[in-house]
Amino acid sequence: MIEDAAIIEEFKRLTLEALTHDGHRGILAGIIDELVGILGNAADFQIDRQLDIAEGEIASSKGLAISPTQAAMCAGEFQRTAIFLRGLHDAITEAVELKSPEPVRVLYAGSGPYATLAVPLMTVFPPEKVRFTVLDIHPVSIASAKSVVHRLGLDRSVEAYMIADACEHTIPSDAIPDILLSETMSTALEREPQVAIMRHLLGQAPDAVIVPESVRVDAFLVDTSKEPDIVVPESEGPPTKWQPDRIPLGPVFELNASTIRSWASLSDDRLPAAAIHIPPPPEPTYRPFLFTTIVTHGEHILRTHDSNLTAIREITDIDNLSAGRSLQFHYRLGAAPCLVAEAED
């Protein structure tokens, strides 16, 4: 239990450093590690490393809800956590300027046991300016998030805690959010219900700002022999000893407020995506891959390999994929959401 006022002040200091640090990535990693450490110490939920980390996953009709343990472990991905915190901070700052003196409402769907992306910002924005609703499908995560908020002295910043499936949640008419926050995704928007959640919630709060602002998936031909053995974040720039060789094939799919609104009339289990053409590869070692780029808000971007969310995934839907063929994509909704490629004759 955290009772020491000095620890709470240290948490505030670390939050400000996480939002502003612009130097060596190793220092940022240390800042986030300390920040998450305080969250973990404040939480009722503790990671049991003797158990399968997938214990507690929920396979819903809209995608996989990862376990509380997995959600807690995700907080330690320093670049991911920092870029989401910075994007949400800027989105809130803009909303406060527009709504003042009324408080800004933030709905955090899929909070995990630490409410990692909300609690630090509760130390930056007073409850008179920003109120959070913390929602998760796992009762243990909500109980833990509540303990974190309480032990850090931030109870007044939370308007409500909700145990609910975000894909089925009905937003109260007197609590329409100004910002919708969800980070319930994996590479290329596979498996997890980010698309379904944002589509469902934005339909009820059509004027809300969404965080992340954009999740874009692009296709590239990749020379796998020239990809690094050790994954290097794109934002660091490639070392001089290797240069990736990637041929752009074009955009495939984007999740943002505009595309979500364009899907309003669609009622089936698929969403439209783009087609790409496969050119003749310079060498047999080239294979088509999907790349994910996440804009949390404004200038705050997760690029290739910055986190597990922006790893690359090979397109394996089509056997014997040859030059000159075209692939038509669509996004499949349901229990196993993902981008699906079909060969065009």
State where each predicted segment sits.
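Conserved hydrophobic residues forming the short capping helix/wall of the S-adenosyl-L-methionine
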Residues: 149
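Conserved SAM-binding loop
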Residues: 145-146
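Class I SAM-dependent methyltransferase Rossmann-like catalytic core
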Residues: 57-96
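Short, charged beta-turn/beta-strand-edge "cap" motif at the junction between a beta-strand
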Residues: 331-337
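Phosphate/oxyanion-binding active-site loops and adjacent basic polyanion-contact surfaces
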Residues: 73-85, 110-117, 137-141, 190
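Conserved SAM-binding loop of SAM-dependent methyltransferases across substrates and taxa
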Residues: 112-128
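Class I SAM-binding transferase module
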Residues: 2-11, 15, 19-39, 52-61, ...
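Conserved class I S-adenosyl-L-methionine
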Residues: 100-114
